[in-house]
Amino acid sequence: MIKTTLLFFATALCEIIGCFLPWLWLKRNASIWLLLPAGISLALFVWLLTLHPAASGRVYAAYGGVYVCTALMWLRVVDGVKLSLYDWTGALIALCGMLIIVAGWGRA
């Protein structure tokens, strides 16, 4: 389960970077060349999703919980926003949901 969780975090990071770089280009007038690493990051994101040993719908559902946590870490580290009690609570609930789904992969 630890390997799966780490893979989910790597997947989420690739997705966030792949979306953040075009956002920088569009909102902050950054270089259009950021679209190249953004495309590579999103392609890596898609490839990483294929490495999970479950049906795609289960993978996407479980991945959503980790994505929430990763996005909140991004909010704190990159955007410099202090997380609220609601952020922490939501992340904990999302992560619990992911763990429940992943724990049932072999039983479904």
From Swiss-Prot:
The chain crosses the membrane at residues 6-26, 31-51, 61-81, 85-105. InterPro entries: UPF0060. It is found in: Cell inner membrane. This is UPF0060 membrane protein YnfA. It comes from Escherichia coli O17:K52:H18 (strain UMN026 / ExPEC). Residues 27-30, 82-84 are cytoplasmic. Residues 1-5, 52-60, 106-108 are periplasmic. One of its GO terms (cellular component) is plasma membrane. Pfam families: UPF0060. The keyword Cell membrane applies. Belongs to the UPF0060 family. Keywords: Cell inner membrane, Cell membrane, Membrane, Transmembrane, Transmembrane helix. The lineage of its organism: Bacteria, Pseudomonadati, Pseudomonadota, Gammaproteobacteria, Enterobacterales. It is a multi-pass membrane protein.
